[in-house]
Regions:
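Conserved catalytic-loop position in the HRD/HxD motif
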Residues: 91
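Helical "lid/coupling" subdomains associated with nucleotide-phosphate turnover
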Residues: 4-30, 35-86, 101-195
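Active-site-adjacent helix-turn-beta-strand microarchitecture at beta-sheet edges
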Residues: 95-97
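Early-domain small/polar-rich strand-loop-helix modules and first-structured segments
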Residues: 1
Length: 195
C-alpha cells in the first residue's frame, strides 16, 4: 500500500494484524503499549485517516514517527545485542531505508531516505525479468540517493541490516549456502557472499 494513498486492502491487513496484537496484549495483561507508524503511513495522503481507523477498529492509538525516530528505534534494538562497535546500520523497509553511522556504540548520524523495497518496485515496474539496462538504471538511482549522504564512510566498515527484507535475504543466503541452522540474529555474510 505505498504511493500517494495507503490502499484500503493494505489498511485492512494491517488492522487485522493489529487486532491480533491487541488481543495478545490483553491476554498477557500488558498495561502499556506503544504502536508507531513509519514511512508507508507517514508519506500517504490518507495516513491520518488510517490511524483513526486503527484506533476505532483495534482500540490502539498509534503515532506516526519521523525517519530519525525510526532510525533511533532500530539502533536501540541492535546496539545491545551486537558485538561490533563501529558499523553502518540500515533498516530497509517497504517505503524507506534508514541508515545510521555507529562509532564506539554511539549513533553519530542517521538519515531516512524514501527508497524502500516496495516503493522501488512500484517506481521501476517491469513485466517479467528486469533487463540489464533497467538494473543499471535502478542502481544509478539508488547510488545517487546514497551519494547525497555526506557522512557515509569512504572505506569499508561492517554493515548491519535489520527488518523483513534483510531477514528474507539472509534466509535465501542460508538455503543457498547450505547453512544448517535457521537462526538469523547475528548471521554474517561477506560482501562476496551476497553476489
Amino acid at each position: 500500500g505505498l504511493g500517494d494513498v495507503y490502499k484500503r486492502q493494505a489498511q485492512n491487513r494491517a488492522i487485522d494484524c493489529l487486532k491480533v496484537y491487541a488481543h495478545l496484549a490483553k491476554v498477557h495483561q500488558v498495561t502499556k503499549t506503544l504502536a508507531v507508524a513509519t514511512a508507508a503511513v507517514r508519506t500517504a495522503r490518507n495516513g491520518s485517516s488510517f490511524l483513526k481507523r486503527v484506533h476505532s477498529a483495534a482500540n490502539i492509538p498509534m503515532t506516526i514517527i519521523s525517519g530519525k525516530q525510526e532510525a533511533a528505534l532500530g539502533f536501540s534494538g541492535v546496539i545491545h545485542t551486537i558485538d561490533t562497535s563501529e558499523f553502518l546500520l540500515f533498516d530497509l523497509g517497504g517505503a524507506s531505508i534508514e541508515i545510521s553511522l555507529v562509532k564506539n556504540k554511539k549513533q553519530l548520524h542517521s538519515v531516512s531516505i524514501p527508497i524502500g523495497a516496495v516503493s522501488l518496485t512500484e517506481k521501476f515496474k517491469s513485466s517479467g525479468l528486469l533487463s540489464a539496462a533497467k538494473i543499471k538504471h535502478i542502481r544509478s538511482y539508488i547510488k545517487s540517493k546514497l551519494q547525497s549522504i555526506p557522512w557515509l564512510p569512504k572505506s569499508p566498515i561492517p554493515v548491519i541490516g535489520i527488518g523483513g527484507t534483510i531477514r528474507n535475504l539472509a534466509k535465501i543466503h542460508q538455503r543457498y549456502s547450505g547453512y544448517p541452522l535457521s537462526k538469523l540474529h547475528n548471521y554474517k555474510v561477506s560482501s562476496q557472499g551476497l553476489f
